[in-house]
Amino acid sequence: MREAMQLVPMVIEQSSRGERSFDIYSRLLRERIIFLNGEVNDTVSALVCAQLLFLEADPEKPINLYINSPGGAVTSGLAMYDTMRFIRAPVHTLCMGTARSMGSFLLMAGEPGERAALPNASILIHQPSGGFQGQASDMLIHAEEILKTKQRMTRLYAEHCGRSYEDFERGMDRDRFMTAEEALEWGLIERILKVREDTSSL
């Protein structure tokens, strides 16, 4: 992680007050761009939620969430989902690279009409997975909780994508990989962006 942080470019800006330097992500945050890059976990979720809440200070302007994620922890993803819905500023989502599992869940949770993917993006939907060791009675409790989570996520996919619960229940039974075109057909996104001119906000 430390080596990766050292590779983050710095941007230098000149102003009447002198010279200021920013890491590239902080500079993009000033343009209301947030990156979800890599695994979804508690640390990443906390950072994204904090940035969403910070940018809500100007609720009339959209926030752009760029996603390139293989997915990860359901609870961490749901924290970001709930924060996206909680704040007043609209959140536009864009998949660049891949949006799998919780990554695709957050992609489809963007503002209706403002969910997009780049042409060669890969999207994956599937049911949540989990594991637990312990007493048989406790394992049954955890199994019931996973089933409840599956039902809740299936319902949310269906609501956001304008399809039936049964469609997503069947679609998520096993790993389902999608191209950008297939994600468009399923309603996870509304647009496939090839050049910047396709949108004024992303």
UniProtKB/Swiss-Prot annotation:
Entry's EC annotation: 3.4.21.92
What Pfam families does its record include? CLP_protease
Q: Which UniProt keywords apply?
A: Cytoplasm, Hydrolase, Protease, Serine protease
A GO cellular-component term linked to this record: endopeptidase Clp complex
* MF annotations from Gene Ontology: ATP-dependent peptidase activity; ATPase binding; serine-type endopeptidase activity
| Enzyme class of the recorded protein, top EC level | hydrolase
Q: Which reaction does it catalyse?
A: Hydrolysis of proteins to small peptides in the presence of ATP and magnesium. alpha-casein is the usual test substrate. In the absence of ATP, only oligopeptides shorter than five residues are hydrolyzed (such as succinyl-Leu-Tyr-|-NHMec, and Leu-Tyr-Leu-|-Tyr-Trp, in which cleavage of the -Tyr-|-Leu- and -Tyr-|-Trp bonds also occurs)
Q: Where in the cell is it found?
A: Cytoplasm
- State the InterPro entries in the record: ClpP, ClpP/crotonase-like_dom_sf, ClpP/TepA, ClpP_His_AS
- Matches recorded under CDD domains: S14_ClpP_2
Per the UniProt entry, what is one GO biological process? protein quality control for misfolded or incompletely synthesized proteins
Q: What does this protein do?
A: Cleaves peptides in various proteins in a process that requires ATP hydrolysis. Has a chymotrypsin-like activity. Plays a major role in the degradation of misfolded proteins.
What is known about its subunit structure?
Fourteen ClpP subunits assemble into 2 heptameric rings which stack back to back to give a disk-like structure with a central cavity, resembling the structure of eukaryotic proteasomes.
Per the record, the similarity remark reads: Belongs to the peptidase S14 family.
Please give the name of this protein. Answer: ATP-dependent Clp protease proteolytic subunit 1
Q: Which organism is it from?
A: Rhizobium etli (strain ATCC 51251 / DSM 11541 / JCM 21823 / NBRC 15573 / CFN 42)
